[in-house]
Design a protein with these regions (language model features):
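Membrane-proximal helix-turn-helix segments that form the acceptor-binding/catalytic region
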Residues: 1-10
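Acidic anion/phosphate-binding donor-loop and adjacent secondary structure
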Residues: 23, 37-54, 101, 126
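Conserved donor-binding/catalytic core segment of Leloir-type glycosyltransferases
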Residues: 48-67, 73-76, 90
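Nucleotide-activated donor-binding/catalytic signature segment of Leloir-type glycosyltransferases, i.e.
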Residues: 101-122
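Aromatic "clamp/platform" in nucleotide-sugar-dependent glycosyltransferases that forms part
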Residues: 139
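Short hydrophobic beta-strand element within catalytic cores of glycosyltransferases
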Residues: 156-159
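Conserved acidic donor-binding segment of nucleotide-sugar-dependent glycosyltransferases
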Residues: 171-172, 176-183, 192-197
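A short, well-ordered alpha-helix in the C-terminal region of glycosyltransferases
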Residues: 185, 192, 199-214, 220-226
């Protein structure tokens, strides 16, 4: 990837982080902004149906270690065994838990974590609508579609402050950002959103408003066509 970035004259990106990375690796390249279209079902306006039984946290993840499954285990352990919180944490995606659970000494079965496997967009959307918040755990990231999809649904996001996530989540307004190596800070923001329903709803509403603009299909297509025209010149 570095070799390609150093060689190409034009690059499309969408975050402060990828713009700055390009400026370091290839300052002569022209940077073009280009948004991302996400899956259709997440654009639909649906009312939230937060569980009244106990808080529900949702995360979408995959098996590479840099996606932060260990972060989920550590935060869940703090919430359950140090805070004494009763919650449900649904983790979707192709998770292979054995390595990180052995490494951390923490088992998902003991921490209210449900490994749900790969799910359709509709199933994930419905799960998000019932959730108190979306949690993003990655160590390496640029512009995660999962964060954008959660924001489009209208739920607040607690995300690791890595790569380009701070271009998607405005801290305190459309979600909260935490240092990826600090599970206590992550636990604090989760508990804050659980304890303060009014703030939770307000942040979710604002997140959807911003996400609808960021992921606007027509605007993204127009911007991309404009980029192509610029490159042709």
């Amino acid at each position: 990837e570095k070799a390609i970035l150093k060689a190409v004259p034009h690059v499309i990106g969408r975050t402060d982080w990828d713009r700055q990375a390009l400026a370091v690796l290839n300052p002569k390249a022209t940077y073009h902004y280009g948004g991302e279209i996400v899956r259709d079902v997440f654009y639909e306006k649906k009312d939230r149906q937060m569980s009244k039984d106990r808080p529900v946290i949702t995360t979408t993840i995959s098996f590479p270690t840099y996606k932060g499954y260990d972060v989920i285990l550590k935060v869940a352990n703090i919430l359950k065994n140090e805070v004494g919180l009763d919650f449900e944490w649904n983790v979707y995606g192709n998770v292979q838990p054995e390595f990180m659970e052995k490494h951390t000494g923490l088992k998902h079965e003991n921490l209210n974590i449900n490994l749900k496997g790969v799910a359709s967009a509709e199933v994930l959307r419905d799960s998000l609508l019932k959730s108190t918040l979306y949690f993003h755990s990655s160590y390496v990231e640029n512009s995660p579609n999962s964060v954008g999809e959660a924001q489009l649904v209208g739920i607040p996001v607690v995300a690791s402050r890595v790569g380009g996530t701070d271009s998607m989540v405005e801290h305190g307004k459309t979600g909260f950002l935490y240092p990826v190596t600090d599970p206590y800070m992550a636990a604090y923001y989760i508990k804050r959103l659980i304890d303060n329903k009014e703030e939770n709803m307000a942040i979710g509403k604002k997140a959807r408003e911003i996400a609808l603009v960021r992921h606007d299909k027509r605007q993204i297509v127009e911007e991309l066509l404009d980029v192509y025209e610029q490159i042709k010149k």
